[in-house]
Curated annotation (Swiss-Prot):
InterPro entries: a-kinase_dom (IPR004166), Alpha-type_PK (IPR051852), eEF-2K (IPR017400), eEF2K_a_kinase_dom (IPR047588), Kinase-like_dom_sf (IPR011009), TPR-like_helical_dom_sf (IPR011990). Monomer or homodimer. Interacts with Calmodulin/CALM1; this interaction is strictly required for phosphorylation activity. Residues 116-326 form the Alpha-type protein kinase domain. Its EC number is 2.7.11.20. It is an enzyme of class 2 (transferase). Residues 27-36 have a biased composition (Acidic residues). It catalyses: [translation elongation factor 2] + ATP = [translation elongation factor 2]-phosphate + ADP + H(+). GO terms for cellular component: cytoplasm; cytosol; dendritic spine; glutamatergic synapse; postsynaptic density. This is Eukaryotic elongation factor 2 kinase. One of its GO terms (biological process) is positive regulation of endocytosis. Residues 81-94 are annotated as: Calmodulin-binding. ATP binds at residues 296-302. Residues 386-404 have a biased composition (Polar residues).
Length: 725
């Protein structure tokens, strides 16, 4: 959000009103009189400032003596902190209302119920608000239309609509279930949590995702629902889509790195994509999860993750944050390198202070956001705020300003502008303002005048339980939610970061038992999804041959990561046997490939795939399709026949394979025959052979094979007769 969009008023430190530019002959915007003023949001209760006025003068005088700080947005320039404040005040005094010409204040006032979502506890809070909404939409997308809206703060003593915040109310063009509106809000607030986690790793530019709530107009027929967001001025850009990378002249590093970060930091559980917005203030993101069942129809699951990584070129930010490149085939890598060349034009400059993804040095500031992932950092805890050196003024409204943590103790919002970039305090949720609040992922109470002691607590933090309205429409301090409570509510989301590279994931899996290894890697499922997209022609132009080499590349990676379907498919493919996945692909028949194929089949058999067990048993039994480095072994064959016969549960991949491919009576009969004759390392056992023939006969009778059952009974008698001899 640009600075022009931040609606706030100026008050004197001692409670006096600021002289307005152009009145009483005092219009000098650069007047030193500005030193006596601080920025106060119109949502603030003026009475609350009386508790801190005694501290303001002393603190502000210290601020004017602060040392110069650097900016990642323009590292060659340095700005004195006092000058930055004066610049922000100047912007505030001359800020016009971009919607003044539409005279929304003349529209009839409507009372609405506002539904806000707390992403920490998963709870909803309802309250009443007053709005004025235009009757005709000013924008229309593929699915929704937008209406200009003003919302009155609940803490104004008079209905001053001309100073009310500008909002955009959105509704679906086609009727949808009401739950869709609530799911959209939940998605955006969950994505906001990941934006805050990304910012805590000190990227060169921080990101923020807009607050969104729901308003229900109960006085209208049908009580329609609308999404409500702050209005943002600026150039709206789509950085990546729900299905991959978007090539644009305005190439950016941060949006792509943010999506990659969410994948690794969540332990591959999800990825935030469809990044779009103004600058690094994003809206309407999409989350792909492992299951693909949450967050509406736009959640493509691991298929969506595959689409992102197929076109993602790791950039300087990815490297500085320790994000591992996703494994692509040489041909895919060549295509992605074209994007890499485009990234060279990006102007983001690294500061060298970026924290590695999942680094134990990344600490969670208590009160800065919900304690999401807090137990994952070994040294998580309150960061010592004695060091408030301002490393950068990032391009996002979510960014932390030099002394925003300290200013928050005084209930001050902080604004700065640099190279058309607005930055705000991101690390403290209790920074109340009419602009978009970044680190605010829980909703506030809307009582007035309940203030805790503004004195900073240990480590320089203030956990003030101020009960203001946050006009951000969603979320207040999460510091009131203890870590233990959050962990209890969200235990399934506490996971360690995992790299996107197969080699590192294989190292992790090798430390697990086999039953915990098969089908447990989400990264393996992503590679398997890449195989399906290649086979389906998604990654090739119409009329072109799809890339079989790349498909086999990803199938091998999926197999190495324990995807049972990939293991079986490769085993059949290398063994020159019919296979259902990549059915059109045939590999050369070489001794090396035969060895690979049998190794994969043996691995699948050990993982519980019944078809592979039978194939391995037959190979050891007859010697056909056996790898060159192995020989016939009836003892092994008997073991795998027995294992297949006992296979009645699901395999390690969670699938159930019945007895359709090989009748039970046939395998029992073959076991009996091997024990009757002996050989290839198996000793003769006539008694057990007769017992197995009897079981085979009973199984044949159950299968309505009476004649075959009689043959088995006869052979059982022959085996027992040999035993008597």
């Amino acid at each position: 959000m640009a600075d022009e969009d931040l609606i706030f008023r100026l008050e004197g430190v001692d409670g006096g009103q600021s002289p307005r530019a152009g009145h009483d002959g005092d219009s000098d915007g650069d007047s030193d009189d500005e030193e006596g003023y601080f920025i106060c949001p119109i949502t603030d209760d003026p009475s609350s400032n009386q508790n801190v006025n005694s501290k303001v003068n002393k603190y502000y005088s210290n601020l004017t003596k602060s040392e110069r700080y650097s900016s990642s947005g323009s590292p060659a320039n340095s700005f004195h902190f006092k000058e930055a404040w004066k610049h922000a005040i100047q912007k505030a005094k001359h800020m016009p209302d971009p919607w003044a010409e539409f005279h929304l204040e003349d529209i009839a006032t409507e009372r609405a119920t506002r539904h806000r979502y707390n992403a920490v506890t998963g709870e909803w809070l309802d309250d009443e608000v007053l709005i004025k909404m235009a009757s005709q939409p000013f924008g229309r997308g593929a699915m929704r239309e937008c209406f200009r809206t003003k919302k009155l703060s609940n803490f104004l003593h008079a209905q001053q609509w001309k100073g009310a915040s500008n909002y955009v109310a959105k509704r679906y063009i086609e009727p949808v279930d009401r739950d869709v509106y609530f799911e959209d809000v939940r998605l955006q607030m969950e994505a906001k949590l990941w934006g805050e986690e990304y910012n805590r790793h000190k990227p060169p530019k921080q990101v923020d995702i807009m607050q969104m709530c729901i308003i229900e107009l109960k006085d209208r027929p049908g009580k329609p629902l609308f999404h409500l967001e702050h209005y943002i001025e600026g150039k709206y850009i789509k950085y990546n889509s729900n299905s991959g990378f978007v090539r644009d002249d305005n190439i950016r590093l941060t949006p792509q790195a943010f999506s990659h970060f969410t994948f690794e930091r969540s332990g591959h559980q999800l990825i935030v994509v469809d990044i779009q917005g103004v600058g690094d203030l994003y809206t309407d993101p999409q989350i792909h999860t492992e299951t693909g069942t949450d967050f509406g129809d736009g959640n493509l699951g691991v298929r969506g993750m595959a689409l992102f990584f197929y076109s993602h070129a790791c950039n300087r930010i990815c490297e500085s944050m320790g994000l591992a490149p996703f494994d692509l085939s040489p041909r895919e890598r060549d295509a992605v390198n074209q994007n890499t060349k485009l990234l060279q034009s990006a102007k983001t400059i690294l500061r060298g202070t970026e924290e590695k993804c999942g680094s134990p040095q990344v600490r969670t500031l208590s009160g800065s956001r919900p304690p999401l992932l807090r137990p994952l950092s070994e040294n998580s805890g309150d960061e010592n705020m004695s060091d408030v050196t301002f490393d950068s003024l990032p391009s996002s409204p979510s960014s932390a300003t030099p002394h925003s943590q300290k200013l928050d103790h005084l209930h001050w919002p902080v604004f700065s502008d640099l190279d058309n970039m607005a930055s705000r305090d991101h690390d403290h949720l209790d920074n109340h303002r009419e602009s978009e609040n970044s680190g605010d992922s829980g909703y506030p109470s809307e009582k007035r005048g309940e203030l805790d002691d503004p004195e900073p607590r240990e480590h320089g933090h203030s956990y003030s339980n101020r009960k203001y309205e946050s006009d951000e429409d969603s979320l207040g301090s999460s510091g009131r939610v203890c870590v233990e409570k959050w962990n209890l509510l969200n235990s399934s989301r506490l996971h360690l970061p995992r790299a996107s590279a197969v080699a590192l994931e294989v190292q992790r899996l090798n430390a697990l038992d086999l039953e915990k290894k098969i089908g447990k890697s989400i990264l393996g499922k992503v590679h398997l999804a890449m195989v399906r997209y290649h086979e389906g022609g998604r990654f090739c132009e119409k009329g072109e041959e799809w890339d079989q080499e790349s498909a086999v590349f990803h199938l091998e990676h999926a197999a190495n990561l324990g995807e049972l379907e990939a293991i079986v498919g490769l085993g059949l493919m290398y063994s020159q046997l019919p296979h259902h996945i990549l059915a059109d692909v045939s590999l050369k028949e070489t001794e090396e490939n035969k060895t690979k194929g049998f190794d994969y089949l043996l691995k699948a058999a050990e993982a519980g795939d019944r078809q592979s067990m039978i194939l391995v048993a037959r190979a050891f039994d007859s010697g056909q399709n056996l790898s060159p480095d192995r020989c016939q072994d009836w003892l092994e064959a008997l073991h795998w026949y027995n294992t297949a016969l006992e296979m009645t549960d699901c395999d390690e991949g969670g699938e159930y394979d019945g007895m359709q491919d090989e009748p039970r009576y046939m395998m029992l009969a073959r076991e009996a025959e091997m024990l009757f004759t002996g050989g290839y390392g198996l000793e003769k056992d006539p008694q057990r052979s007769g017992d197995l023939y009897t079981q085979a006969a009973e199984a044949a009778m159950e299968a309505m094979k009476g004649r075959l059952a009689n043959q088995y009974y006869q052979k059982a008698e022959e085996a027992w007769a040999q035993m008597e001899e």
